[in-house]
Amino acid sequence: MGLEDPLYMPQDMFYHKETKCLYIADTDNSRIVVLNHDYQVVKIIDSLNYDGDIESFSSPYGVYVDTDGAIYVADTKNERIVKCDLEGNVLGLFGPPSSPALESEDFRYQPRKLVVDKDGYIYVQAQHVYQGILCFDRDGNFVQFFGSNRVDVTAELLFEQMLRVFMTREQRSKMLTFVPMEYSNLYLSQKGFIYAVTSKTQDSLNEIKKINTNGDNVLRVNSYRNTASYKKNNYGDYPIYYSNEGQVIDTSFIDLHYDEMGYITALDETRGRVFVYDDESNLMFIFGGLGEQLGTFSRPTAVEKIDNDILVLDREEGAITIFRQTDFGRTVFEAIQLYNEGKYLEAMEPWQMVLQQNSNFNVAYNGLGKAYMQMEQYNMAMHYFKLGYDKIGYSDARQELFALWARENFGIIIIAILIFILIPFVVPWLLSRRKKRKGVYDSF
């Protein structure tokens, strides 16, 4: 990087496509470090010019750069958001939100992560704010809470609420408080959706969300393996396992990235692993880990993507690890891109190449199943969906196969239906006629 003073406990990084620069929140050095496309230092913002007065950051945890190049910094210990230019000239200072929900003696506004939409609205993830993401207008006025996590009603929660009725105030104060889990990070897509991660959830589900303007989670989940022991909206490692001390060890997402191709890259702090999902929550790849060898981390804290490279920031080491796309990964993404472009036949060859390298790659089987679906070869589609454990795809292919059979045998089906309808009328009529004829013969 070419830094005289190395990074010290950095907490965030952001890649700005327009300038092709990487911005790093060097937290314990209280500065913003800017790197060029060769990862060399081009600027260090360690002081601010605010109307002639010199100010500084205090443990900035988050950084974001809008399309115009304005830099937004979550100046955590100063309890504010700073908007400045590359030279450190302050363009705006936005302090704590004004909300009755946050009015308490114990509350301290500590913004951690942030994004800014095309209209200048600022979305902030703050520590110990359980009501959701904080939304400010372009002037820094608090607007609303956004996309709050819910507390699910469980038997334990109902039992606790019943007990509270019979307890004193002192006893109630010592009980656990059930509050929504706070988000740990957020990312803004080009289409204006906010993707957010929660480090822990109540039932270890929905750790990754795609939040629309109404605050609803609209992330697609193609639940081809939803069972009692596995759910597609359970992101990260599964199943949960226990250490020797009986402690639950679960995935704890600390950051995520969403790219133009529709892939979500999420970083797990617990095991130091990187998870890549497609836009239907299908798991594509897992890599990384905790350790000292190449490709592992001590305490990962942020993930970013530049073209096909995935970057992971390690706060303890003060270093960035760059993962290059392999030939296998390139073939997978090529197949998906061809399918998305409607080139179903062309997509089959790279999927077959993927399976030659990894016959357990379910996404490839499902990709072939989708290609055969588009070519109306439903028997083959069912075969590959079955290999890929895609129940929904298999069911859709079976329905289409039945619909195709029905169209091809429409005339026979109509005749069969007419016969079925007419039988109750024709049979009694024939029997009645037979009886009449028998009566005529008997009279002779």
Task: For the regions a language model picked out, list residue spans one by one.
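Eukaryotic scaffold repeat domains enriched in small/polar residues
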Residues: 1-378, 388-389, 395-428, 433-444
